[in-house]
Each structure stands twice: as structure tokens, then as C-alpha cells.
Amino acid sequence: MSKNKAHITVNDKKIELSVRKGTLGPDVIEIASLYKETDTFTYDPGFTSTASCESKITYIDGNEGILLYRGYPIDQLAEKGDFLESCYLLLYGELPTKQEKIDFDRCIMQHTMVHEQFARFFHGFRRDSHPMAVMIACLGAMSAFYHDSIDITDPQQRMIASIRLISKVPTLAAMAYKYSIGQAFVYPRNDLSYAANFLRMCFSVPCEEYKINPVLTRAMDRIFTLHADHEQNASTSTVRLAGSSGANPFACIAAGVACLWGPAHGGANEACLKMLQEIGSVERIPEFIARAKDKNDSFRLMGFGHRVYKNYDPRAKIMQQTCHEVLKELNIQNDPLLDIAITLENIALNDEYFIEKKLYPNVDFYSGITLKALGFPTEMFTVLFALARSVGWVAQWKEMIEDPAQKISRPRQLYTGYAAREYIPIDKRVN
């Protein structure tokens, strides 16, 4: 390979391909001309070696354990800023000035109300419906309630839709939770912070005044920030794929929520908590460690390893600290699940098997314990993930729509089915 070119030979035909260099990360070989030049496609199941787009939003270095939003390390954003500051950063590319932050916060909080007909919309679901099923429906329904902001060719409508999604998803998520437990919906309060408002909508009841706890509010805000974006993962790619067809933003985000519901993607923290409950006690950990190492055993240690990170997940360190702060604030001492988690973490960081396979604790490892301590049932965990990730999806969708090189996505395939064959009348068919 030359400095800016790659050469490939297919069936004795040699072609030259351009090599593009990003700000960070591996170089990328442009293969758009490959089919035209050689009548061949590339084959990359799961897109593990394929850059599907050009983006300026989020960067991950899995080998070094680095996650950047617009160039800023995730730990600095989570510890020094707040979620809406990260929202502004992801949407506009720069951290806001003091006045820009005030104006943006006010804009978001002024749009937290949802159409009153949504209350009746919820009553169309069974009470025991999974909150993610309800969220998918609600996000799709937003295009019916807010059809004045679905023209993707209008920059003003794109921005209005973006603001509405970021501001209203917490309200819909809280309504989904309240509906599932048979309690009255709680209207948002615009004088509260984003995280405090969400916690109040989830946990306040008419019979007593809800008191804002700054430690729990800060924990919720950090969880939102840590999950705001994560490059071109399955759900983000789904949003981009749907958006490439010209679908309205509400439909695209609903598609992202549907993808996130998959247990291999957004359900990891719920699965991790269930695993800790299955282990039950510190004394049983060796048994489950042995099972995890046994290739013939289907058991997997959830919360360890990551498809991208081959080092310690930078979000996990902040999540661990946040978890301890919440447990201390709520005076949860000697929590058996936390004891199991800490013991498992120590084993993973010192056991040769885990070190060799680079199975480090990820963000899901501690987030499940934290969310449980905050009072959320496991069915709400992925809903909270979707709430936080909405801003990342919106930023990625907006970037894609505004890219002049954008075109409808059309993946290819390696076809291994039958070649053309003649139709056989039904009375002449045999097994």
C-alpha cells in the first residue's frame, strides 16, 4: 500500500483505491468503485471492518479505553459538566458559553410537555406491557402529534424536531413507568433540572411532596451523559439507515429504540443484574467463574468485555464511583449484589483468563445496581438507556441529513441460495 493508495488484484485485474485518513483512528480504504471496476463486493458480516459513514461526533479507541464526545473525554464531561451541556455539544459541535447554556436549558425545559391526547394513547396498552414496547409506539406516534416538524428538508423543522425529542422523551419514559405501576401521570416542572425533573415525574405521588435529592439527581445526570452516544453501534446505525430513506426523525428514533431493545445491545445492564441475582452470594462466585471458562457451558458473565473496548471501559470507572455514592446516600450497606460485583471485578482484573481475553468490566456492570438502588425496576433499564441515547441518535441523524454526500443505504449480500429453476406444478412435486 502506498501512502494514500491501496492496490487490490481481483481475477488478474489490478485496481487502485483511495485511502482516507481521519483525525484519529485507522485509515479507511474507499471501496465505492470496487463493484464497478471488478464486479465484486466486499463481505463483512456485522460490519466489523467497515466504516459506514463519515462522522465528527464521537470517537472510540477500544484498545486504549478512550471515549470522546466532539473531542472531549467522557470522564471530564460526566464529572465537570451536566447532561444538557453534553447534548448541546453533540448537537452543535462545541461546548456552550454561559449564556448559550442558559438559553439551551430553557429551550429544552419549555418543551417537556407532551400532547394531552398521549394520556389516552397510553390507555390503549395493557398495564403489563413492557415499557420498551410502549416507548417504541410513543416515539412513532410523535410524528402524528407533531407533524409540523417532520419535513427533513427544512433546517428549522429539523431543529424543532431535535429539541422536541430531547425534551419530551423523558416525559414519555416517566409516563410509561407510571402507567406500568398503575399510578397517575406526573406533569413536568420547567423550573427543575433535566435529571431532577425526570426523577420527580417517575417517583412523586399526589399524597406527599417529592423532595429533590442532589446526590441521586447527579447520579441520574451522569448516567444520561455516559450513555448519550457511542459511535456507530447497532441502534445508531439503525437510525442512520432509516434516516437515509428520508423517514421523519420521530420514526427514525423509534427504529433506534426497537434495535436497542435487543438483549445483545441495550439489555445488557438488565441481564447483568439478573446474573448477580442468580449468583446469589460471594461464596458461589467460583462456581460461576468456572462455568464462564467452560466452553461447553452456555453461561456467560454479563457486564464483562465489550465488542469495541479491549481495555477498561472508561464509562465503567465513573459508573463505579456513582454507584458507591448512591448506595452511601441511601444508606444501603453490605449490599449483597454490590459485594458480588466487587468480588467479580477483582477476579476479572487479576485472573489470567480474563486478562488474556481482555474481559474488563463495562458500563453495564455497575449501572444495573445503581438503577435498582434509585428505585427503577429492571424493565425500565433499557428505557433509561434509550432516553439518554436519544440525543446521540438525534445528533447522528442530523449530521447524516446535512451531509451532501448522503444517499439511501443499500447493503449488498453474498447470495448462497438456489440458482434460477423452473416452477413445478403442485401435483408433480415430491419431497
Curated annotation (Swiss-Prot):
Gene3D superfamilies hit by this protein: 2.20.28.60, Citrate Synthase, domain 1, Cytochrome P450-Terp, domain 2
Protein origin, superkingdom: Bacteria
A GO cellular component annotation in the UniProt record: cytoplasm
Catalytic activities: oxaloacetate + acetyl-CoA + H2O = citrate + CoA + H(+)
Residues at the active site: H306, D364
EC assignment: 2.3.3.16
Keywords, comma-separated and alphabetical: Transferase, Tricarboxylic acid cycle
GO biological process: tricarboxylic acid cycle
GO molecular function terms attached to this record: citrate (Si)-synthase activity
Family membership: Belongs to the citrate synthase family.
Miscellaneous: Citrate synthase is found in nearly all cells capable of oxidative metabolism.
Protein name per UniProt: Citrate synthase
This protein's encoding gene: gltA
